[in-house]
From Swiss-Prot:
Catalytic activity: ATP + H2O = ADP + phosphate + H(+)
Short motif (Q motif): ranges: 97-125
Residue ranges with Basic and acidic residues bias: 349-358, 867-877, 900-918
The protein's role, per its UniProt record: ATP-binding RNA helicase involved in the biogenesis of 60S ribosomal subunits and is required for the normal formation of 25S and 5.8S rRNAs.
Lineage: Eukaryota, Fungi, Dikarya, Ascomycota, Saccharomycotina
Protein name: ATP-dependent RNA helicase DBP10
Gene label: DBP10
GO CC terms of this entry: cytosol; nucleolus; preribosome, large subunit precursor
Keywords: ATP-binding, Helicase, Hydrolase, Nucleotide-binding, Nucleus, Ribosome biogenesis, RNA-binding, rRNA processing
Length: 932
């Protein structure tokens, strides 16, 4: 049997499990989470009573292998898999490096196969075996590498089933609401077929509903730190039963201001827990990770963090001041060739907006006061290996004000746009992301902070509206395209102030900046050298950072278009003013470029060639025009208007002519020296340029960048703080060969705890020193415009007070830190009293009545209709409703069938009854004792 025809254990198990499961189970899960736009693989249709067959030599379509091209030797992964296969008897027959080799249970392998996963990604191959060995792991891999499954699969395998004892067993903390929702969806899908109870706790949801969820005794909690701490303090939760805690996107957890919440939560966790930290980057804030209580952590780091895909092509467009908007419109329309929205698409988009806003869902029936809900067919998400749309593009902007500005501009230009920023409402986030993922909109405008955790598998293009201040942020941005072997483009708009950051990126990536003048000079040298055999070299947009400007004629056309849009839309001009102010604050807080790059950028700007027409647009048609203008500047006759047509005596007697003659004599030496200086600088520049190009030609390097530049962190320092995963496996293999010891029962005479303490107390090898080598910081644009003092009217005090005043009541938490006292408001106690619930104690056995199916109470009461009114248009319609209700057994107030006693009295009967009552009162009533 060849390698291509290997027996797929996971797929076989999945097929065996799917035959025995009814279709209703699959559909019920989809209905339960149909409003969560987080997964790509839920559009697989299951047909009952039909077995699926895998063709030989043809693999089933799987989730894209986003990391298979990483610099990871095959023998290393095989050694790692073989080691853990040897220790797990259930996985000895499984193929090395596959999911069954990790020792997963049958139900988990079935769920993995249903999700479409066939082979684990590199981060999963390295971390899952270590997590199964109960080691604390720090995992570093880029976005989209499968980090979520790397910690979710071991979680489900370890917990296996619901525990009858009260207490949370696993906690997953995410920095954003949408990321928490995505992780919760993954946990639900991988734990399908078990009785594990999982809930999600995010801000913006009802506290009462979350109280109900917590009372179901969940095993797994996926939450954001702020809301989880709120519930912990409000409900006085004990976390002594926690076995497994995950900090997802750990760098953002600390950078977004969750340090206070995390320190409070960490203090309440037991020391025997297993802690996992997963992130796309290693920022400066990792010094706080040492406080998280990791014990002898293992660092799993992939080399792809400082690299970009080989299929990614990049173009950098130089612009002048106030041309950024016009350049963006040109890139979208002429480079990406994104079509404008058709009337049908606009109508479809508006219908979806109305549906999501609830204008149609809340149409009220006038008669029975019940809400009528229109049924609609929810669009399916495309598979993970397909583009949401042909021209799907994500645009990165610096602040949320730019998101509003660019979104308004593109909508006015005729595009359908989705947008996401940090403070956007949770429902609006889901709605905007869903519209982009189903292809309703082709553009998504986001900030760097909001883009973290957004689950978009494949994109066609990435546009950097502004060049980021960090090279690693650039890699994070462009890493969202050119995945899974697909090609992609990244377009960046660069002005003079951002040129130093481009030069920093040149050094970071090891790819040289290529100007149009450099390419032309290279072509001239090759033409001279090769003569008749000359072939113009192709420009590599993957190995070079090609910089140039957009054609001047085209940019002027789009500049006029932008000015017309701005002139005709007042709202756009208002939003532009806000974005301009936000941009100033952003530039003020952005980290500066290196001094060497600043110096080099000034040299490039002085040459005047940095904004030549980009090589992407072919030959420069404006060059002939420029040559003609240059000839006019170099004409022999350089007379001014004062000397023109002045001849003979008139020329000699004119005072202005004499003045210009003297002026030329004075300026001539200065002009001569300036000309000599320019020629000398040009010779020096061309000498260096020619030397570099000649070296490339002689060495046949082509478009290769810097080969000697290294950007990796110091491995010696990292080894002092972490154990390397590969070395750990190799060490275990050697010990297994040479030693007779059984690792499960042998007690060593060494004291590893003391060694760990010595390493932690060492000043030269600390976690903070290691983390400082690889930094990646995102500026939180939400806090840029937060003034230190904002005066607000206090109605109780009757005067203005500081809105950000620290005059608040605090309570001391378990960590000794002060936390807001508003967390403990007594709402849970009131909620519990209303339902007569008894207090539960962590560790005790749960009550049998505890319901963990996450199903809400549904009202099934049928109300009787109102009586028909003869003076209304719907009299006959309402009469039929009343008749049907009476026939079904309902009692309609005031309605009697023919022959029954009339319960309602007429106005004449009421009048007669009142007259009889008055007569009786006059006859029998006693006189009043009150004084008149």
């Amino acid at each position: 049997m060849s390698d291509e025809e290997d027996y797929d254990i996971a797929g076989t198990l999945a097929l065996a499990g799917s035959d025995s499961e009814p279709e209703s189970d699959l559909n019920s899960d989809n209905e339960e989470v149909q409003d969560e736009i987080v997964s790509d693989e839920d559009d697989t249709k299951h047909k009952p009573n039909k077995k699926q067959k895998l063709e030989k030599g043809k693999s089933k379509q799987t989730f894209p292998s986003l990391e298979l091209s990483d610099d990871e030797a095959e023998n290393e992964s095989k050694d790692m898999a073989s080691y853990f296969v040897a220790n797990n008897p259930q996985a000895k027959k499984a193929k090395n490096g596959s999911f069954p080799s990790f020792g997963f249970s049958k139900f988990l392998l079935t769920n993995i196969s249903k999700k479409g996963f066939k082979q684990p990604t590199p981060i999963q191959r390295k971390t899952i075996p270590l997590i199964m060995e109960n080691r604390d792991v720090v995992g570093m891999a880029r976005t989209g590498s499968g980090k979520t499954a790397a910690f979710t699969l071991p979680l489900v395998e370890k917990l296996k089933s619901h525990s009858p004892r009260v207490g949370v067993r696993a906690i997953i903390l995410s920095p954003s609401r949408e990321l928490a929702s995505q992780t919760f969806k993954q946990v639900k899908e991988f734990s399908k077929g078990t009785d594990l109870r999982s809930i999600v706790l995010i801000g913006g949801d009802s506290l009462e509903e979350q109280f109900s969820s917590m009372m179901t005794n969940p095993d797994v909690i996926v939450a954001t730190p702020g809301r989880f701490l709120h519930l912990k303090v409000e409900m006085e939760l004990e976390l002594k039963t926690v076995e497994y805690i995950v900090f997802d996107e750990a760098d953002r957890l600390f950078e977004m201001g969750f340090a206070e919440q995390l320190n409070e939560l960490i203090a309440a966790l037991p020391s025997s827990r297993q802690s996992l930290l997963f992130s796309a980057t290693l920022p400066r804030s990792l010094i706080d990770f040492a406080k998280a209580g990791l014990t002898n952590p293992v660092l799993v780091r992939l080399d792809a963090e400082t690299k970009i895909s080989d299929q990614l092509q990049m173009a950098f467009f130089s612009i002048k001041n106030n041309e950024r908007e016009a350049s963006l419109l040109y890139v979208l329309q002429e480079v990406i060739k994104l079509p404008l929205a058709s009337p049908e698409e606009v109508k479809r988009y508006s219908d979806m907006e109305k549906r999501d806003n609830g204008s149609e869902d809340e149409a009220e029936d006038e008669n029975n006061n019940k809400k009528k809900r229109f049924k609609f067919k929810k669009e399916r998400l495309p598979p993970a290996n397909m583009l949401p749309s042909k021209h799907s593009t994500i645009i990165f902007v610096p602040t949320k004000h730019h998101v509003e500005y660019v979104t308004t501009l593109l909508k006015d230009a005729g595009y359908l746009v989705s947008y996401i920023y940090g403070t956007l409402d949770q429902h609006a986030r889901k709605q905007q992301l869903y519209q982009f993922r189903i292809g309703m909109t082709s553009l998504l405008v986001v900030t760097d902070v909001a883009a973290r955790g957004i689950d978009i598998p494949i994109l066609a293009n990435v546009v950097n509206y502004t060049l980021p201040g960090s090279s690693k942020i650039f890699i994070h941005r462009v890493g969202r395209t050119a995945r899974a072997g697909n090609s992609g483009w990244a377009y960046s708009i660069v002005n003079e102030k951002e040129l130093p950051y481009l030069l920093d990126l040149e050094l970071f990536l090891g790819r040289k900046v290529l100007l149009t003048s450099m390419h032309e000079k290279k072509c001239e040298m090759l033409k001279t050298k090769q003569s008749s055999n000359y072939v113009e070299p192709k420009v590599s947009y993957t190995d070079r950072l090609v910089l140039g400007s957009i054609p001047r004629v085209d940019i002027e056309t789009f500049q006029e278009l932008y000015e017309n849009i701005l002139r005709n839309h007042y709202e756009l001009s208002v939003v532009k003013g806000v974005a301009t102010k936000g941009e100033k604050l952003y530039y003020r807080t952005r980290q500066s470029a290196s001094q060497e790059s600043l110096k080099r950028s000034k040299e490039i700007l002085s040459t005047g060639n940095w904004d030549d027409q980009h090589l992407l647009f072919g030959p420069n048609l404006e060059k002939e025009k420029e040559k003609f203008l240059t000839q006019l500047l170099n004409r022999k006759s350089k007379e001014t208007v004062f000397e023109f047509n002045k001849k003979g005596n008139d020329r000699d007697e004119d005072s202005l002519v004499e003045f210009m003659h003297k002026r030329r004599k004075q300026i001539a030496p200065i002009q001569r020296r300036a000309k000599e200086k320019r020629e000398l600088l040009e010779k020096e520049r061309m000498a260096g340029l020619t030397h570099g190009i000649e070296n490339e030609i002689l060495k046949n390097d082509g478009e290769i960048g810097y080969s000697g530049i290294t950007i990796e962190a110091d491995e010696e320092e990292l080894q002092d703080a972490f154990e390397d995963a590969d070395e750990l496996i190799e060490k275990k293999k050697i010990e297994k060969k040479k030693s007779f010891r059984d690792p499960q029962y042998f007690l060593s005479h060494y004291a590893p705890a003391a060694v760990i303490q010595d390493q932690q107390l060492s000043l030269s090898s600390s976690f903070a020193n290691d983390a400082a080598k690889a930094t990646f910081d995102l500026d939180n644009d939400e806090k840029l415009n937060a003034n230190k003092q904002v005066m607000q009217w206090d109605r109780k005090k009757g005067n203005y007070v500081n809105a950000h005043s620290t005059d608040k009541k605090f309570i001391i938490g378990e960590s000794g830190q002060k936390i807001p006292a508003t967390y403990r408001s007594g709402r849970f106690d009131d909620w519990k009293k209303q339902r007569n619930l008894k207090p539960t104690k962590t560790g005790a056995m749960e009550a049998n009545a505890t319901n963990g199916n996450d199903r809400r109470f549904k009202h099934k009461k049928v109300a009787s209709p109102k009586l028909p009114d003869k003076f209304r248009d719907d009299y006959h319609k309402q009469k039929e409703k009343v008749k049907k209700a009476v026939d079904s057994g309902l009692k309609v107030k005031g309605y009697n069938k023919p022959g029954q006693k009339q319960e309602l009295r007429s106005t004449e009967d009421i009048r007669k009854a009142r007259e009889a009552k008055d007569k009786k009162k006059q006859k029998n009533a006693r006189p009043s004792r009150k004084r008149k």
